[in-house]
Amino acid sequence: MRVYQFCRPFQLFTYFLCYLLVFVKANKEKISQKNYQVCAGMYSKEDWKGKIDPFISFNLKKISGLSDESDPGLVVAIYDFQDFEHLGVQLPDEEMYYICDDYAIDIGICEEENRDEFIVQDVVYDPYTSTNRSLANPIMTFSQNEVGLHDTRYPIKETGFYCVTAFRSSTSTKFNAVVNFRNAYGQLAGTEINKLPLYGLLAVAYVVAMALYSFAFWKHKHELLPLQKYLLAFFVFLTAETIFVWAYYDLKNEKGDTAGIKVYMVFLSILTAGKVTFSFFLLLIIALGYGIVYPKLNKTLMRRCQMYGALTYAICIGFLIQSYLTDMEAPSPLILITLIPMALALIIFYYMIIRSMTKTVIYLKEQRQIVKLNMYKKLLYIIYASFLSVLAGSIVSSFIYVGMNTIDMIEKNWRSRFFVTDFWPTLVYFIVFVTIAFLWRPTDTSYMLAASQQLPTDPENVADFDLGDLQSFDDQDDASIITGERGIDEDDLNLNFTDDEEGHDNVNNHSQGHGPVSPSPTK
C-alpha cells in the first residue's frame, strides 16, 4: 500500500514541531496517532557523566485497528534531528515517500530487506550549504505491531537533539506509546539538568545574603522598623523557596516524574504564587511610604493592602490548581476563568504601586526631603533596570541565533534557552530583591531617618522632636501615627488611594498647626 499520503506534511512539519517540542519537560514522553513525533535534547556520557549509557527506548502500550496479522502496525524512526532530511525519497511527481513497502520496492527506491522500515538515504543535498550531506549519526528504524518494549535501544554517542517518529500503516490504526529519553546522569530531561547546579548555587547565594542581612538585623535589633522585619521574613521565605526548587530537580533526577513529584510540584507552585504576591505587596507598602516616609501606615489602609494581597494569592493558587488539572494536549477555554482574574489582579497591583510611588516622590520633593527622595529614586531605577535586564536577555538570545539556519538553531538552542526563559528572570529577581533589602537594611541612622525630616530644608514647618518619642512607635495606635490628634475616619481609606488615603495629605493638613507631620515621631 502506498503510505506517502500520510507522510506528505512530515518534512515541513518537522521544522516547527521540533522547535515547539524543544522544551520537553520529562524524560518520558507519550506518542500517539495524534502526536506522532516527539523530540528532546540528549547529552552523551562524555559531556555529562552518569552511571549508565544514555539511550532512547520505544515502548508500545496499546495498538488497535490492524487490518490483519501481516499489518506492520507502526513504522518507527529514531534519529538525530539534523539528519531528518535523510528520511524519505522524493518521487518524480515531487511527492515525498517515506516507507519501504511493496510500491517502494517495485520502483526500486528501497530493498526487500528494508521492508516496513523508513527509507533512509546516506547522502542528501543540503539546500542551506549547497553541498551534499552525510548522516551525522545512525538512524534506527523498525516496525512493531505488538504491545511491549522494543528489544533494541538507540544509543546516544554524541550530544544532540533527537527525535522519534511513528507512522501508521493504515488510517484505522490507533496506538499509544512511551518514548524514554534516558540520559546518563538520571531522570531529568536534557533541557532541565543545568538547572540543578544553578539553583543550588542560587540557594547558597540566598543563604549568604540572608546571613548578612540577619547580622545587620541583630546588630540593630533595638532600632528596627516594621518594614525591615517584613524584609527579613521574606528573605527567609525566598531562601527556603529556592532550596525547595533545587530539591525538586534533585528528587526528579533521582526518582523520575512520579505521582509524589507531581504533588511536590503543586506545592512548589503554591510557594511561587506566594513569592509573586508578597513581592507586589512589599513594593506597594514601600511605595506608600511605609517605614521611611511614615513609620507605619494607617491601620485600615494596611489591612486593606493585606486583604488585597491575600485575594491575589488565592486567585494565583486557583489558576495553578486548574492548570494542573487541565490536559495540556487538549487545553480548555475554561482556564480563562482563573487566568483573566489573575492577570487583572496583578495589573491592578502594578498600577497601585506606580501611582503610589509617584505620589510619594512628589510629596518628598515638596517637602525637600532629599535623602528619602534619593532612596525612592534609587528604588525606581532598580525597578526599571530589572525590566530592562529581562528584556535585554531576550534580545541578546535572539541576536545570538540570527544568521543560523533552522537546523543549527534547533540543535543548539535547547541547551541554553532555559537560561533566558527560566533562570535569567529568577537571577534578576534575586539581584533586585537583595539590592532593595540592602537599601532598606537596618543601620544606625535608618530608624532616625524614618522618624525625622530634614528640618533645615523647610524651616517654616519644623516641629519639635524628642528622642524619647521613638519609644512611642511601639505604643501608639497605628492610625494615630499618621493621622495625629485630628484623627481620620477609617472609611475614608480604601485601595483607590485618593489623597486622603495615602497619608501624604494627612501630613500636609496637619502641618498647618504642627509642621509637616503629625505630633507623633514622623518628623
Curated annotation (Swiss-Prot):
It comes from Saccharomyces cerevisiae (strain YJM789). It is found in: Golgi apparatus membrane; Early endosome membrane. Belongs to the LU7TM family. The chain crosses the membrane at residues 198-218, 231-251, 266-286, 305-325, 334-354, 382-402, 418-438. This is Membrane protein PTM1. Residues 27-197, 252-265, 326-333, 403-417 are lumenal. The keyword Transmembrane applies. The modification Phosphothreonine is found at T483, T498. Residues 219-230, 287-304, 355-381, 439-523 are cytoplasmic. Residues 483-523 are annotated as: Disordered. Keywords: Endosome, Glycoprotein, Golgi apparatus, Membrane, Phosphoprotein, Signal, Transmembrane, Transmembrane helix. The lineage of its organism: Eukaryota, Fungi, Dikarya, Ascomycota, Saccharomycotina. The gene is PTM1.
